[in-house]
């Protein structure tokens, strides 16, 4: 006799159906979804770069009693700690009463870097009496999308004397913005015959930053005028760009979309739309489990370097937890569980051929689990086990979470990767789960408020 399937038995319906979160929600629940999104929009506007997201997150958790952790310090049950990784990554540790040797650590990891335009180390030049800053794009972008939109400049500059200057120009209503020009349609006959890749060259993604020449100077007078302003306001000289990290990002705020305000458009949903709910879930959850909430850098370029998830820092911190609890680090890792909280591609009816409808994440139908990512034959993917997904199904069913399953587009069309494979390589069960996004990697992306809130709910259920 076949065992009864308790999930299907309640409805006497053995089919899989997605559920529209908005259709299920009553007026009170709609209000909760909307209110939660307001906090998220402020988080987005205050954090346009990975450094700003980390600073904003530290402020959030310090307000809840979290303290800075130093490697080597003992971690005690009940401690609320964070490790700030070079100002660009963050590890939030909530030390629980449960046995970490038996239960492991509940790990949530999202990334807080987003596609953008970085300034080159020698960026400033003048041409045709106009001053420009040269850029080098970061992450996967469609270059043409960055033309003719208002851009802000964020980041830090290390001066010759060792002091640090923080820049944020273009966000305040009274600030100037920066701009990349495009060719008018009247003269685009030749340009229109080229492919997008040939027509929009990376070396032409240069920011227009000035136009008033210094009086009495004949050569590079406009460039000198810009340098005079930078030196007067910030103490910056041209050589200081060598030790700077300056990022051009869209100078736009997060805004509701639609007459019914069902959606939020913003820069940086990928992956701050998962970072925010994993923070709020860590703060809100009522749990005895030890929780590690990670905000990682460098995911968009392969998770490389000291602030990416290929760095050994996560292992160091797990070892510190194990040592503090008197547990074997290998056993702690073996019994830990992880959700790689990263966005997925939402099914877009305008580009339906890029998807396989039945196995795509649909906007408004809840947070989406991707069993695997990768490309073509799952190349470069973490492929989560049936047992681990079965465990999460039970967790979410018990908590009444609305969620769905999906893949990143049609087979053989393209693909993508996340940090999941780096976590699972440590012998930790890991699966990708995040919010479906429309126009992913565009300067202005779109998500559903309902999907955002179900991510928060799912992450709470996971850590509890």
PLM feature segments, named:
Residues 1-464:
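N-terminal hydrophobic/helix-forming segments and targeting peptides
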């Amino acid at each position: 006799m076949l065992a009864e399937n308790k999930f299907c038995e309640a409805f006497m319906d053995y089919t899989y159906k997605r559920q529209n979160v908005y259709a299920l929600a009553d007026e009170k629940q709609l209000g909760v979804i909307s209110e939660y999104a307001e906090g998220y929009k402020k988080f987005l506007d205050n954090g346009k770069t990975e450094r700003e997201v980390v600073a904003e997150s530290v402020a959030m958790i310090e307000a809840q009693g979290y303290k800075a952790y130093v490697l080597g310090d003992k971690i005690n049950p009940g401690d609320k700690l964070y490790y700030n990784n070079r100002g660009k990554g963050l590890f939030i540790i909530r030390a629980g009463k449960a046995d970490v040797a038996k239960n492991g650590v509940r790990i949530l990891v999202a990334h807080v870097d987003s596609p953008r335009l970085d300034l080159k180390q020698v960026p400033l030049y003048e041409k045709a009496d106009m001053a420009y800053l040269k850029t080098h794009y970061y992450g996967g972008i469609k270059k043409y999308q960055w033309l003719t939109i208002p851009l802000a400049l964020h980041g830090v500059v290390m001066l010759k004397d060792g002091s640090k200057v923080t820049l944020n120009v273009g966000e305040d209503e009274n600030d100037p913005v920066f701009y990349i020009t495009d060719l008018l349609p009247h003269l685009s006959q030749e340009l229109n015959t080229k492919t997008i890749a040939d027509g929009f060259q990376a070396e032409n993604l240069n920011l227009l930053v000035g136009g008033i020449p210094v009086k009495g100077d004949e050569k590079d007078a406009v460039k000198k005028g810009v340098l005079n302003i930078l030196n007067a306001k910030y103490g910056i000289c041209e050589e200081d760009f060598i030790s700077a990290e300056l990022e051009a990002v869209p100078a736009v705020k997060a805004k509701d979309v639609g007459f019914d305000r069902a959606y939020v458009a913003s820069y940086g949903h990928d992956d701050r739309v998962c970072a925010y709910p994993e923070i709020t879930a860590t703060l809100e959850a009522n749990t005895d489990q030890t929780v590690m909430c990670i905000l990682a850098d460098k995911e968009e370029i392969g998770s490389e370097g000291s602030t990416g998830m290929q760095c050994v820092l996560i292992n160091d911190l797990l070892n510190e937890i194990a040592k503090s609890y008197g547990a074997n680090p290998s056993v702690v890792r073996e019994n830990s569980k992880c959700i790689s909280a990263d966005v997925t591609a939402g099914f877009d009816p305008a580009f339906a051929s890029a998807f396989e409808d039945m196995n795509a994440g649909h906007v408004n139908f809840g947070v989406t689990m991707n069993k695997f990512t990768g490309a073509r034959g799952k190349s470069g993917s973490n492929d989560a086990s049936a047992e681990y997904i079965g465990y999460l199904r039970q967790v979410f069913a018990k908590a009444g979470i609305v969620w769905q399953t999906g893949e990143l587009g049609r087979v053989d069309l393209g693909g993508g990767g996340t940090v999941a494979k780096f976590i699972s390589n440590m012998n930790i069960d890991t699966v990708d789960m995040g919010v479906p996004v429309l126009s992913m990697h565009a300067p202005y992306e779109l998500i559903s408020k309902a999907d955002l809130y179900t991510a928060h709910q799912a992450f709470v259920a996971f850590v509890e």
